[in-house]
């Protein structure tokens, strides 16, 4: 038996401001194979909105749009008491001594997910930097797999499949009271 998921652009998915995560619970608690239909890089859903300034790519107010936003499409930095916490940490696994980058300002290159400090001091307790999911379209899937510690499979053609498909949207609306 297989559980199929279709990303539909839910901005709350694994976002720290939204503790209620029914799809995450579904994936973690299923004993079925999980298949996610990936975002196609060439679809009509652009990663930037009309009128967006290209050079705002690294600003926290302008994360890229995507079919499968995860963590709000930003890396979250929390710092205080001499410690720095990064979520998702996947991008920074090579850092062995976080104290060397504590209270530093972070940014990234335009294309790809090469994050670096610009050397400027940043004492804000919380800040975020958008990550690139457009030029790395499978990145949300890898982040999800890394976060949940579950094996995810990537599907590529749902038209031939006859099993039940669970859309993220359907799962969320079943668990939310949307009455006005």
PLM regions with names:
Residues 2-180:
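Conserved serine DD-peptidase/penicillin-binding transpeptidase domain
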């Amino acid at each position: 038996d297989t559980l199929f998921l279709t990303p539909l652009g839910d901005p709350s998915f694994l976002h720290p401001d939204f503790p209620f995560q029914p799809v995450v619970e579904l994936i973690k608690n299923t004993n079925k194979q999980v298949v996610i239909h990936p975002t196609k890089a060439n679809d009509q859903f652009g990663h930037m909105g009309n009128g967006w300034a290209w050079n705002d790519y690294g600003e926290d107010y302008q994360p890229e749009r995507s079919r499968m936003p995860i963590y709000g499409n930003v890396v979250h930095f929390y710092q205080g008491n001499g410690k720095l916490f990064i979520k998702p940490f996947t991008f920074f696994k090579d850092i062995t001594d976080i104290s060397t980058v504590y209270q530093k300002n972070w940014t990234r290159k335009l294309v790809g997910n090469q994050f670096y400090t610009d050397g400027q001091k940043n004492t804000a307790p919380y800040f975020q930097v958008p990550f690139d999911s457009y030029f790395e379209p499978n990145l949300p899937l890898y982040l999800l797999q890394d976060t949940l510690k579950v094996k995810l499979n990537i599907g590529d053609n749902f038209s031939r499949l006859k099993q039940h498909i669970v859309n993220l949207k359907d799962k969320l609306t079943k668990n939310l009271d949307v009455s006005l």
